[in-house]
Amino acid sequence: MLKAEQRLYRFSANLGFLWTHLPLDEAIIRAADAGFDAVECHWPYDMPASQIADALEATGLSMQGINARCGDRAAGEFGLAALPGRQAEARADIDEAIAYAAAINAAAVHVMAGKSDASPAAQQCYRDNLAYAASQAMPHGLTILIEPINRMDVPGYHLSYVEDGVELITALGFENIKLMFDCYHTQIMQGDICRRLTANLHHIGHVQMAAVPDRGEPDAGELFYPAVLAALYAAGYQGFVGAEYRPRDTIDAGLGWLAKFKQAGGR
């Protein structure tokens, strides 16, 4: 029997890293067959939203989040929201993401800040674009997510510290702007994962995990995820945890963690 404070662990397959060799609608089906409770992805825009909606309905999975476009990936861009002079493009991408997310009944849109010079102009640009995104998302019941991303993998990324994200969310004052707390990124930049999760739970809209340092399956590496998940759900988290990792071997060979973690969470 579950203790009163215990929550059932729920896991979302990140299809930006898993089953990437398949069309997105087929990847959703594979995630359901593997035992995931939901899915999330990066940039679904090459496939009509109706096709994704059909796959979600067929599997009974929800789409936890998608990313707004990140600019010119070939040129190394990693988001536009904090780039002065790119506001029109950033907002067009935000509009596109919100419309797509609403069409597939997704939970959230991740607005990526990008690599900035951290100048006052960049800070103001980011704030203005997030306020715009939150206002546009609100009628659809969508959450806008911001994610601190480590600067070892993405040098110069505008937002890299949890507390900076929380401070920004608090200052903006929109109920539908939340933190996407990626344990992999935060462990690299700051550590102290369990305390940061529980201390900032009110501001967290989604959680992601992967092993540190190799970003592989979450059952190895320096973070002991059974303890992290126990602390997270005991603190009252009711959402999904995104499995955003790069398989060390084949996807199927590395999926043993899923059943183990579900069992630990009362499944």
Question: What residue spans do the PLM features occupy?
Answer:
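Histidine-acidic metal/acid-base catalytic patches
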Residues: M1-S12, F17-G35, N105-A106, L159-F181, ...
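Active-site acidic/histidine proton-transfer and metal-coordination neighborhood
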Residues: E5, L80-K178
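N-terminal small/glycine-rich loop or linker at the start of catalytic domains
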Residues: L2-L15, G65-A81, H110-K115, I149
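Conserved beta-strand positions in the central sheet of alpha/beta enzyme cores
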Residues: E40, G65-N67, H110, L145, ...
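Active-site-proximal loop/turn and secondary-structure-junction residues that shape catalytic pockets
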Residues: F17-W19, Y45, R69-D72, A113-D117, ...
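Active-site-adjacent beta->alpha loops and helix N-cap segments on the catalytic face
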Residues: D46-A55
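A short beta-strand-loop structural module common to alpha/beta enzyme folds
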Residues: D37-D46
